[in-house]
């Protein structure tokens, strides 16, 4: 509610993901127009894979599916060879794009512009966020920060299990995300205290 991005740090198996999904469900109940997205980037190995996962997660999911929304998305992302598939059970479309190395920054900008132009309140949880520090591209943090800071209607939850890496990313004055988000540490609940 304070309109700040949040950094959520806890060891694995403490309940970060469950907490994020619970908060998203509460947000959707209290604000039905709000859009909430969750993506786990642990399996991504570079910026290109990150951008493709982000596109698959959010593109086409912000608005209700219509022909005009479909055309708008295809036009906006036409240079990335968009492909559309439909979930066989729900019929909900899923978009994916092919991005060349030269198109990475431009495609990320287009995705964030798409979110900004929606005008809707959007929350995006990026789990295992420390993974971006392992990418071979050294400027990933700066690239993301340069876009994220100009999204007035999009809020991020940066979740991670590596306390050292996450703290370094958000508390070191030399890093792009320095003091950009509110820090929250989760620790195990004492069984004796709550049972």
Segments from the language model and where they lie:
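Active-site catalytic pocket residues across diverse enzymes, especially alpha/beta-hydrolases
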Residues: 27-31, 148, 173-174
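Conserved small helical "lid"/interfacial subdomain of P-loop NTPases
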Residues: 186-195
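Short glycine-/polar-rich loops that comprise or flank the Walker A/P-loop
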Residues: 32-36, 152-154, 179-182
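Conserved Walker B catalytic segment
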Residues: 5, 94-162, 171
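Hydrophobic residues at beta-strand termini and immediately following loops
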Residues: 39, 184-186
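Short regulatory helix/loop adjacent to the ATP-binding pocket of P-loop NTPases
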Residues: 163-181
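N-terminal pre-P-loop "Q-motif" helix
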Residues: 1
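P-loop NTPase nucleotide-binding core
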Residues: 4-5, 10-14, 18-123
């Amino acid at each position: 509610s304070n309109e700040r991005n949040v950094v959520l740090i806890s060891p694995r198996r403490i309940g970060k993901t469950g907490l994020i999904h619970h908060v998203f469900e509460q947000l959707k109940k209290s604000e039905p127009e709000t859009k909430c997205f969750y993506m786990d980037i642990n399996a991504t190995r570079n910026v290109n894979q990150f951008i493709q996962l982000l596109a698959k997660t959010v593109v086409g999911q912000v608005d209700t599916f219509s022909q005009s929304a479909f055309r708008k998305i295809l036009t906006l992302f036409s240079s990335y060879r968009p492909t559309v598939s439909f979930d066989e059970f729900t019929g909900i479309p899923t978009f994916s794009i092919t991005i060349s190395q030269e198109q990475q920054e431009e495609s990320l900008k287009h995705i964030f512009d798409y979110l900004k132009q929606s005008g809707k309140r959007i929350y995006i949880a990026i789990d295992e966020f420390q993974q971006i520090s392992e990418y071979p591209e050294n400027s990933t943090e700066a690239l993301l920060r340069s876009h994220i800071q100009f999204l007035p209607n999009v809020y991020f939850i940066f979740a991670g299990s590596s306390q050292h890496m996450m703290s370094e990313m958000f508390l070191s004055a030399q890093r792009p995300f320095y003091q950009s988000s509110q820090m929250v540490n989760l620790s195990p609940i004492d069984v004796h205290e709550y049972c």
